[in-house]
Amino acid sequence: MPEVVDTCSLASPATVCRTKHLHLRCSVDFTRRALTGVAALTIQSQEDNLRSLILDTKDLTIEKVVINGQEVKYALGEKQSYKGSPMEISLPIALSKNQEVVIEISFETSPKSSALQWLTPEQTSGKEHPYLFSQCQAIHCRAFLPCQDTPSVKLTYTAEVSVPKELVALMSAIRDGEAPDPADPSRKIYKFSQKVPIPCYLIALVVGALESRKIGPRTLVWSEKEQVDKSAYEFSETESMLKIAEDLGGPYVWGQYDRLVLPPSFSYGGMENPCLTFVTPTLLAGDKSLSNVIAHEISHTWTGNLVTNKTWDHFWLNEGHTVYLERHICGRLFGEKFRHFHALGGWGELQNTVKTLGETQAFTKLVVDLTDTDPDVAYSSVPYEKGFALLFHLEQLLGGPEVFLGFLKAYVEKFSYKSITTDDWKNFLFSHFKDKVDILNQVDWDAWLYSPGLPPIKPNYDMTLTNACIALSQRWITAKEKDLNTFSATDLKDLSSHQVNEFLAQVLQRAPLPLGHVKRMQEVYNCNAINNSEIRFRWLRLCIQSKWEEAIPLALKMATEQGRMKFTRPLFKDLAAFDKSHDQAIQTYHAHKASMHPVTAMLVGKDLKVE
C-alpha cells in the first residue's frame, strides 16, 4: 500500500524522519503577547543519507537554529495560508537510518498566533491578572513552536516555562516542580514531563491565576478561584467514570488525570490534553447534567491519545470511538436506556448537520479528503455521530455491546502508541471477527465510509426515554392557537434536563413555530430562566428562528458571553438570517472579534460572510 500522505502538514513526513522528544524552554510575555524560547527537538532519521529536513511553522519568528553547538542554515518558505510556512533545516552531517540529532530552534510566537489566546484581566473572572491558553488541535501546534505538525508522529516532551510569579503554569504533562527564575526574581519557572509519546496537537499550556481542588485520588480540578468550588462539585463523578473507562479500555497509563475549567472564550466543549483535560465553563450546569462531555474527554485517553488518527482525513477514528466509549460510560452509570437515549439524540444531531451542510457535501463523508482544506473549516458533528452510528450498527450486527466492547479493548491494545488509518481499523475488525466475516461482508462499506449524506442504515434505538420528548414536541408542533391553553408547567415535571433538551431539539427540527406558540412556551415553562447551556442554546435558536424580537438581546448575549463554537456559530448564523437582527449580529461580531478566540473569530466571520 502507498504511504498515507498528511496533506495538512508541510513538514518532512514520518517516512523521512520522526521527532522522538521535545525539550521546551520558554518564557511567557503578557505585555508583548509572545512566547519566547528554545525548542530542542530530538529527531530520528528514517532513511540513509538525510541531509536536510522540513518542519512546520506558522507566524513564528526564528532567531537561530543550533546543532551540536553550531549554528546551521535554515530557510523559511512562503506562507501557505492556514498551513503556515515550511522551515527547511540543513544538517551539518548526513544522518544514516535510525541516527538521531538534537536540533535547537530559538523562536518567538506572534501575538496573532492561531494556537494561543491571550486574555486581558477584564476577560477573566478575577479581573486582576491576564491569562493565556493554547489550543493546538488540529494543526495549530506549528503556531506555538516549530514541529512536525502531524498526528502520524508521536513524541515525549519535557518543558520549563517562566511566568510572572503570581501566576500558575500547567501543561498536558505531569507537574515536575517549580522554582524562582534565576534570571528574574519577579518570575517563577514551572517544570513538566510527559513520558507517554503523544502527537503534537496534544501539547498544551495554560497560564493564569489558577487554584486547584482535589476531587479524586488522581484528579485535581483547576480554575480561577471564582469557579473552583463549583467545578469541584460539577465534576465529582470523575473517578467513578475513570474506573469504568479503565474497565472498558484498559489501564490508565498517564498517571494524573486533572481537569482545567477555562474562561468562557474557550472554543470547544472539551479538549483531551493528556493529564489535564481542558473544559468549557458552559458545563457548569449546577446539577452535573452535562457530565457526558467529561465521559467523552476521559474516553479520549484511549481512543485519540493512545490510538490516534494518522491524518485528519481519518478524524472519525478518534471521535467515533470516543463517543462510543463515552456513551458506554454513561450507560454503566445511568442505565442502558440512557445510552440509547443519547445515541438517538446523536442521530438527530447528525441529521441536523447533514441538512445544514447538504447531503452531497463532501464533509458529510466519514473519511474526508482534506487536500487544500483547513480541518477547522471541515469540522462538524459528522466524525462524531456518523462514526458512532457505524460502531453502534456493528455492535448490533456482531452480537451486542459486550461482544463489541471486547473488540474495542483489543483494538486499543493492538494500536496503542500508534497512529492509524481507516484501513488499519477495518483490517483489524475483520481479523478480530474472523468467524463473522460473512456478516461484515454484508455491510455497505463504501456507503458508510466514503459516501456523503446520512448512513445507509439507521441503527435500532430503545425509545423509552425519547418517547416523552417526541410526544410533547408533537403536541406543540401540531397545536392550533386554540390549543395553547392546554399546556402547563406540569408538562416538564417528569422530564430530566436531558429530556427537556431533547424535547427542544425535536421542536427545533421543525422550526419555525408560530410566534404565539413560542411566547406561550416561555409563559408556561419559563425557558428564559433555565441556565443549562444546552437547553438555553436550543431555546434561543427556536426563538430567533420563530422571529421573536424580544429574544434578540438574549441570543446576542449567549453568542458573545461564551465562545464555545457549538453554541456561538449557530446563534450568530440564526441572528444573521433574521432580518430584524441581521445588522446587529454583524455589528456585534465586529465589536467582539478582538476578544474572541482566533479560530472562533475566523469561522464566525466566514459564517457571516464578512471575512
Swiss-Prot record:
A cellular component term, taken from the record's GO annotations: nucleus
Subcellular location: Cytoplasm
Reactions the enzyme catalyzes: leukotriene A4 + H2O = leukotriene B4; (5S,6S)-epoxy-(18R)-hydroxy-(7E,9E,11Z,14Z,16E)-eicosapentaenoate + H2O = resolvin E1; (5S,6S)-epoxy-(18S)-hydroxy-(7E,9E,11Z,14Z,16E)-eicosapentaenoate + H2O = 18S-resolvin E1; Release of the N-terminal residue from a tripeptide
Keyword Ribosomal protein attributed: no
Keywords, alphabetical: Acetylation, Cytoplasm, Hydrolase, Leukotriene biosynthesis, Metal-binding, Metalloprotease, Phosphoprotein, Protease, Zinc
Activation and inhibition: Inhibited by bestatin. The epoxide hydrolase activity is restrained by suicide inactivation that involves binding of LTA4 to Tyr-379. 4-(4-benzylphenyl)thiazol-2-amine (ARM1) selectively inhibits the epoxide hydrolase activity.
Residues annotated to bind Zn(2+): H296, H300, E319
SUPFAM superfamilies: ARM repeat, Leukotriene A4 hydrolase N-terminal domain, Metalloproteases ('zincins'), catalytic domain
Disulfide bonds: none
EC numbers: 3.3.2.6, 3.4.11.4
Gene3D superfamilies: 3.30.2010.30, Neutral Protease Domain 2, Peptidase M1, leukotriene A4 hydrolase/aminopeptidase C-terminal domain, tricorn interacting facor f3 domain
One of the Pfam families matching this protein, by short name: Peptidase_M1_N
N6-acetyllysine: modified positions: K73, K337, K414, K573
Active site per UniProt: E297, Y384
Post-translational modification comment from the UniProt entry: Phosphorylation at Ser-416 inhibits leukotriene-A4 hydrolase activity. activity.
GO MF terms, alphabetically ordered: aminopeptidase activity; epoxide hydrolase activity; leukotriene-A4 hydrolase activity; metallopeptidase activity; tripeptide aminopeptidase activity; zinc ion binding
Subunit record text: Monomer.
PANTHER family associated with the record: LEUKOTRIENE A-4 HYDROLASE
The protein, known as: Leukotriene A-4 hydrolase
